[in-house]
Amino acid sequence: MDNFAPRRPALSTGLKVDIAFYPLWRSATWGFAPVSTVKVDIVIYLWAANLPFMRPDHRRYAAAALLYAAAFAYILLRWDAIPDPVPVHINIAGEADGFKPKTLINATALLVIGVIMTLALPLCVPPRSLARQTVGVPAADALPASGTAARRVEKLCDATATVMSKIVLALAALFAILNISMVVPDVNLPFWLEIVLWGTFLVYVVAVSLRISHSNNGIAPDAEEETRDHQLRYAGGMGTYSAPNDPMVAAVLPSNPGKIAVNTAHAPGKRYLWRVAASIIAIAVTCIVLPFL
């Protein structure tokens, strides 16, 4: 019977974007400028057989990559229409009040920031493996490991991954529209519409984030989790807690039932926090350094 079972096709890269520039780029002070006409060939391969097997959050990340690729391509194809110097800032009246030389980095600054955020933000999502990962602790005063506590963490990890992918996709759409509107004069959006887009994005982020706190409802605690909750009722803060006698690496604490808390007393928890810190630093450095390039 196994011979007749449907086979899942081998997964390869779900998204491939090839961008070729003709002619070659030459250095122009800080940045790059095209020698003459820019020909952009974008070839996107989406394997239909593989897409149904991609996780929903991965499909959203792939869609975000497509949006950024399309925005980059459109700016390059409309390069001759972009003014020099290129506007890089808009004041409260909706008028451009900041300009920089027309270079690729200056014309796509918002897209670059968005790409960095797309790469960094998913690293802030707690990996699902933390839920059932345990470490050895002295048996004398060890807290019990709990199956329901692990399931609670898993559900919150899944919900966080879903919310983060939705935010990344919405951010890609927003940044692509705003970047094109800023640098291409004939597709410039009214300032009030840009404010509406920002407001809609913020409302959407709040709306999808509220779903995380309700994702672990319906899980009845077992005896081990009740013991843990009693011992850890005063622990935790800012998504972390330190309990050397807890064999579990992550938990949902009674003080904040809608949030995953990572046990910083153990190495896996510390490694995850370093990953989050590196992601935040990468975003901050990009936002600070890019305006000076």
Description of each model-found segment:
Residues 119-142, 208-221:
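Membrane-water interface of transmembrane alpha-helices
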